[in-house]
Amino acid sequence: ERAGIPWVNGESTSPKLTKRGFKYFFRVTPHDGEFTQLMFEFMNDFNKKNDGALKTLGILHEDTLWGSDSGSTQNKMAKKQKYKVVEKIAYKAKTTTLDSEVQRLKAKNPDVLLPSSYTSDAYLFLNTASKLNYSPKLLVAQNAGYTDPKFIATMGSKAEGVITRSPFNTDLAKTIPLIGDINRLFKKHSGGRDLSDVPARAFTGFMALAQAINVAGSTDPKAIQTALQNIDIGPETLIVPYRGVKFGKDGQNTKTRGILMQVQNGKYCTVYPF
C-alpha cells in the first residue's frame, strides 16, 4: 500500500482485510463473512426440510487472526439468525491437546459444530473426539484444515460426514467444463494430485491479475490498479462457481459464490446449494 503496488489476493478470507481502506489490495475470493452466510443459509434450508431440527450451535476456533475473525463472525451471525450458541471455544493455534475443549462440546452436544481449524488442529480435534467418544451431530467447517489435500487420506473414516465450505470442488466440472481442462494441466505438475480449493483460488486470482495487465497494456502499477478497479470478468472464463470478478470500492470481489461439500465414501461431494 505504501509503495503503491497492486496486490491481488486469491485466498485470504479474513473479512477485515477489505475494511481497512486499502486502495491497492484486491481480493478475488469470498471472505469468511460470505462463507458464514452460506453456512447459515444451508442450516435454514435444512431446517425447512427437517422441521427445524437445528437449534443450537458450538463454535470452535484457533486463536490467530483468521480463526478469531471467523469465530466472531459466526457468533454474530448466530445471534442474528436466532440460533443459540451453547459453546464458543478459542484454543491456542499450536496446541497439542484439545481434550478439555472436546469434553465441553460433548457435554453441551450442539446440533451443529462450526470449527475454524488449520490442518494439524483439525486432525487433533477429530482424533480427540474419537478417543473421547464424541461424534458431532453435524460438523460444518470453515475450510482450512478440513480441505487440506491430505485430509481425507490422513483421517480416513474419521473424515466421513464432515461438511466444509469451499469455493471449489472438482465435481463441479459437470457444470463448469473448464475445470477438467485446468485439472489435467495441474495434475501433470502435481504428481497426479487433483486441483483443490486453495490452488484453484490462487489460479483464479492470478488470472484476474493477468487479465488486468493485458487491459492496462502496461506493467505500470497505477495503470494496473486502474484496470483492476474497472475489470469485469464473466463466469465463463473461471474454474470456480463465482458469478464473475468485479471489485467494489473496498477491493472485494462483488461476484463471489461458494459451496458446501461433504466427505462421502472418501471423496468430497458438493451438497449445497441443494
Model region roles, listed by residue range:
Residues E1-F274:
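Extracytosolic ligand-binding ectodomains
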